[in-house]
Amino acid sequence: LEHKLFAAEEGDLSLEFEKMGASVNAFTSFNETMYYASGVKNVGPMIDLLFKLVGQPYFTDENVAKEIPIIQQELAMYQDEPDWILGDRLLRGSYGDCNLAIDVAGTKESIASVTKENLQAAYDENYVASRMSFVACGDFTDNQVKTILRQARKLSDQYLKTGSPQKEADLVPLLASGQDW
């Protein structure tokens, strides 16, 4: 799912980030999937594109089939790393036949069974505003933070199903500009 959200009808969205001088990436762990973009200019358009990336999935039979061997190869690469092997054995030893024993990336067999329909079902279940957080980090003034948060609210309303609505209080900075940890 994480890989496929970079796909759009018009092509690979990561190329759009590159055109504006930004980088974008994602990762999935046991408890979260994070999509992030970094750049020093074009913050507004970068945020727009990030919400488009997570809010407009483009799943086709063709692009899902094309991604399966890529993900299987990535999984095989991880399975050659000693720290992955140790973690995998620890999970299997701790959880046995429970689903928690299976690596978050899945297995070669489970990856082969992915379809656009089950990707869409997983997306619909998990990619809702009430299950997502937006974080902006940088040297922003208080007014810039307020502008970014208003933009994030508008884009969330535009691109994401609500689930249970976030209150405005959920969209406040953790630290005011200029504060130290």
Mark where each language-model region is.
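Catalytic Zn2+-binding segment of zinc metalloproteases
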Residues: 1-11
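Charge-rich, well-structured scaffold segments of protease-associated domains
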Residues: 9-175
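Short, intrinsically disordered, charge-balanced linker/junction segments flanking boundaries
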Residues: 175-181
